[in-house]
């Protein structure tokens, strides 16, 4: 437990940010799973709308620094490939 006032404040801030980051990452993962579930059920329309939502969540995670931009591009590319495979 920190004794210095600034260290106490930093600990509080870190805990708040950790909780906030966890919610953003969780929402991103949920959106990705929704796309994958739609693809597994061969629901092309649902998969396309879920893909746009997932891309939005992934981009927000990049903007806040939770996910590296290259990793985000990889996630979006793999999801898009799965969705495009349905219509082919």
Curated annotation (Swiss-Prot):
Gene3D superfamilies: Ribosomal protein S20 (1.20.58.110). Keywords: Ribonucleoprotein, Ribosomal protein, RNA-binding, rRNA-binding. It comes from the Bacteria. GO terms for biological process: translation. Residues 1-20 are annotated as: Disordered. One of its GO terms (cellular component) is small ribosomal subunit. Binds directly to 16S ribosomal RNA. This is Small ribosomal subunit protein bS20. It comes from Bacillus velezensis (strain DSM 23117 / BGSC 10A6 / LMG 26770 / FZB42) (Bacillus amyloliquefaciens subsp. plantarum).
